[in-house]
């Protein structure tokens, strides 16, 4: 009977009757990461969820995100702590009219299977709001973690507000085949820029040039970076979208034009390092070329969140934005997925399909 009716029906009946029945599974971090994250740093535990109050929804995760910030941020939490992260989840019971059953939300619920929250309340500081996914069929709802979610908005606002890229300018992107980088390159092409990417394999570079329309892409593991820049950016570089940091960023910033703009988005090249690497001094390039270098967190545009999502949705519908996903499977494989993404297994966005 239960199987025939489906989980949603069962959850609604129990929740309307006020009987708490749903048991959530969640990852708790017990040990700070050293080097790559390990399964033994975590424990999966179960908790029984309480009864829905007015305004609350119960969700069931369908896709969980693995993102580089997870490796970098956990040191800021007191242990043990619930693992942070975004997810796309289905609303399976609701006492909030704006968030009806059957719809999908993107939320910062962490690595857990089921969640109760009031999506109408403002998010905790540093977290993103819980948002209803627009109708994106025939595309998968997992795009709410990628081009139509946090990485998509990072690309949109980082490029438009920080780089302020203009038609005819040359932009260089590191981490170019990942979720943010591959998206930045496509928006920059749509603006009319020359786009040069650096990524970690020949296959990724071929994907960037042939599928996404990058003008040039180079394998940073095998290329001479200076020669690659001369070859790929004959008019030098106006904008640099920095996803990786380290020596490659110094080399690129030394190859920029006067008044170039650098969007410092992340520094994944050192996230797994306990001791931060030393790189060649950057100040001469910044001073003599009068560069504008600005770090940013995408949360800066939390009040304009929908603007970014809608702009990316428009590009998707116009056929100007392609996407690729590396899909891992199973709630038990979250750590493998996180490590795989940090090692560069993904082209495009890395996500985990929960079931
Ligand atoms: N500021 C913000 O608000 C914000 C928001 C989202 C993301 N970010 C940052 O943006 C960057 C990209 O994030 P994402 O979500 O799009 O991840 P991603 O690029 O989809 O995945 C991470 C990629 O990093 C690359 N990588 C790993 N080790 C590297 C190394 N030593 N040197 C160069 N590249 C390396 C790998 O690709 P390869 O095969 O090419 O090495 C891997 O696929 C990260 O630094 C992240 O922290 C910042």
Q: Which residue ranges define each predicted feature?
A:
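C-terminal hydrophobic helical "lid"/dimerization subdomain
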Residues: 22, 302-355
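Glycine-rich beta-strand-centered segment in the early N-terminal region that forms part
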Residues: 48-66, 70-112
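NAD(P)H dinucleotide-binding glycine-rich loop of Rossmann-like/cofactor-binding domains
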Residues: 85-90, 101-175, 320
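N-terminal Rossmann-like NAD(P) cofactor-binding module of classical short-chain dehydrogenase/reductase
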Residues: 106, 172, 218, 238-241
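Mid-domain Rossmann-like dinucleotide-binding core that forms the NAD(H)/NADP(H) cofactor-binding site
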Residues: 145-223
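Short amphipathic alpha-helix with an adjacent loop that forms part of the alpha/beta core around
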Residues: 224-235
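Glycine-rich phosphate-binding loop and adjacent beta-alpha segment
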Residues: 247-321, 355
């Amino acid at each position: 009977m239960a199987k025939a009716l489906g989980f949603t029906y069962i959850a609604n009946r129990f929740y309307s009757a006020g009987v708490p029945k749903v048991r959530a599974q969640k990852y708790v971090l017990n040990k700070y990461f050293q080097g790559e994250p390990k399964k033994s740093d975590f424990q999966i535990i179960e908790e029984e969820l309480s009864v829905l109050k007015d305004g609350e929804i119960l969700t069931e995760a369908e896709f969980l995100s693995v993102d580089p910030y997870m490796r970098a941020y956990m040191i800021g939490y007191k242990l043990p702590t619930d693992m942070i992260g975004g997810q796309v989840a289905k609303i399976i019971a609701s006492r909030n009219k704006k968030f009806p059953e059957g719809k999908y939300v993107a939320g910062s619920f962490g690595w857990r299977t089921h969640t109760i929250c009031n999506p109408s309340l403002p998010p905790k500081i540093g977290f993103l709001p819980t948002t209803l996914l627009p109708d994106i069929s025939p595309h998968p709802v997992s795009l709410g973690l990628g081009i139509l979610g946090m990485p998509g908005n990072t690309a949109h606002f980082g490029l438009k507000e920080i780089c302020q890229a203009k038609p005819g300018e040359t932009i260089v992107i590191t981490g170019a085949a990942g979720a943010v980088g591959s998206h930045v390159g496509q928006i920059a092409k749509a603006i009319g820029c020359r786009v040069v990417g650096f990524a970690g394999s020949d296959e990724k570079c071929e994907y960037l040039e042939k599928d996404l329309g990058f003008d040039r892409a180079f394998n940073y593991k095998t290329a001479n970076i200076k020669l690659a820049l001369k070859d790929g950016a004959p008019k030098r570089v106006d904008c640099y979208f920095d996803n990786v940091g380290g020596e490659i960023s110094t080399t690129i910033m030394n190859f920029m034009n006067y008044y170039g703009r650098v969007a410092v988005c992340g520094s994944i090249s050192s996230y797994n390092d306990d001791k931060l690497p030393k790189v060649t001094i950057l100040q001469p390039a910044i001073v003599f070329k009068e560069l504008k270098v600005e770090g940013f967190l995408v949360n800066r545009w939390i009040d304009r969140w929908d603007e970014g999502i809608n702009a990316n949705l428009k590009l998707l519908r116009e056929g100007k934005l392609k996407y690729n996903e590396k899909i891992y499977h199973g709630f038990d494989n979250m750590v493998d997925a996180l490590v795989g993404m940090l090692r560069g297994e993904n082209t495009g966005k890395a996500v985990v399909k929960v079931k």
